[in-house]
Design a protein with these regions (language model features):
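Exoplasmic/lumenal beta-rich domain surfaces
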Residues: 100-135, 216-223, 260-324
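Surface-exposed, glycine-biased beta-strand/turn segments
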Residues: 17-90, 94-100, 107-112, 134-136, ...
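Catalytic-site microenvironment of enzymes
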Residues: 16, 188, 323, 327
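Bacterial Sec-dependent N-terminal signal peptides
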Residues: 1-27
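Histidine-centered divalent metal-coordination motifs
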Residues: 105, 159-165
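Short loop/turn motifs enriched for small/polar and acidic residues
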Residues: 165-167, 279-280
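Short, compositionally biased serine/threonine- and acidic-rich segments at solvent-exposed termini, linkers
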Residues: 164-166, 322-325
Length: 327
């Protein structure tokens, strides 16, 4: 039986650094800002939401609607959707470099496009519409005014939801990988650390139930302190953590989490890309029963068999479970 379980955690800042785990090269100066105000974020990429990951950035619009939204790069309007839920009024622009930018919760589209959409709504005699366009219908140049920001659909307040997707696969990428400004010198905060016995032969302090082990933060070193436990068998860990950003009071999802045990990396995952169809696996990443009970999303630092997420940067066989040896 191991008397003391020691684990080392590294929580990266929100900003995706140049040495990010992703193997794909992202253009850093291709896409411009979709707004003409300094960018500040209300929500970041792959934040954990109810039953899904957040697919983009929520950009603040100073608490109001009607800010001009601009095409981030040359391309053409490929699709318009209008709905009373979800993204509300949303525009998709395809670009020649293989990416699609998405602009959601819009108040209205630029006049020529707005006129076309209204005519289609009258023709179909319904509000909710989805219209696809040819490259020659509504071509745009970088910086063209294409819409006004709003609060439509499932939005809880005025903002612009902005995404960058792969045009072919529709997988979403972290927009911060494309060079958007993001001043962040505040480390993420850890609110809880949980130890879980995995399997019938495992126990923590003699009990087959999870145990909260976080005691608090050392003010002198900024390190987090944990209680001493005894454990046997296979142990998993989970962490409740949120990130902060310079200049805002918002809380954000962390960009990367790594688990190290005795100098060896046991598990690591990074939110660079959101694969289409993987949202249902979110609830395998978190302690779902605890979330239902308390609303806190404790993220597992071990991989359960039913977890098919592609976010992991460590090999499949490295599942993050710690085998406690006698001694």
């Amino acid at each position: 039986m191991l008397r003391f379980l020691i684990a080392f955690f590294s929580f990266s800042l929100l900003y995706a650094q140049q040495q990010a785990a992703s193997q794909r090269e992202f253009p850093k100066d291709y896409f411009g800002s979709p707004l003409d105000i300094p960018l500040s974020y209300a929500g970041n990429f792959c934040e954990l939401r109810p039953n899904h990951f957040h697919g983009g950035l929520d950009i603040k619009t100073d608490g109001k609607e009607g800010l001009k939204v601009y095409a981030a790069a040359e391309g053409f309007v490929s699709c318009i959707k209008v709905s009373t839920y979800g993204y509300g009024k949303v525009m998709y622009i395809d670009h020649p470099n293989g990416y699609t930018t998405v602009y959601a919760h819009l108040q209205k589209f630029a006049p020529e496009i707005e006129k076309f959409v209204k005519e289609r709504q009258y023709l179909l005699e319904k509000y909710d519409v989805e219209i696809e366009f040819k490259p020659t219908d509504f071509p745009v140049k970088k910086g063209d005014w294409v819409a006004l920001s709003g609060n439509t659909g499932g939005s809880a307040g005025p903002h612009l939801h902005y995404e960058i997707r792969d045009t072919q696969t529709t997988n979403a990428y972290n927009p911060l990988l494309f060079g958007y400004p993001n001043e962040d010198d505040i480390a993420p905060l850890v609110y809880n650390l949980v130890a879980y016995p995995i399997g019938e032969e495992s126990a923590i302090d003699g009990m087959q139930e999870e145990r909260n082990v976080l005691l608090g933060k050392d003010k002198n070193t900024d390190e987090y302190l944990t209680s001493k436990i005894t454990a046997q068998g296979r142990i998993g860990l989970g962490v409740y953590t949120l990130d902060k950003m310079t200049g805002t009071r918002n809380s954000y999802g962390v960009y990367k989490i790594s688990l190290w045990v005795n100098g060896s990396e046991k598990l690591s995952y990074t939110f660079d890309e959101l694969i289409k169809g993987e949202d249902p696996y979110l609830n395998t990443l978190i302690d779902y029963p605890l979330y239902v009970k308390t609303g806190a999303r404790v993220q597992h630092l071990y991989r359960e068999p039913q977890n098919k997420l592609s976010i992991y940067t460590t090999p499949q066989e490295s599942d993050g479970i710690i085998q406690v040896e006698d001694g």
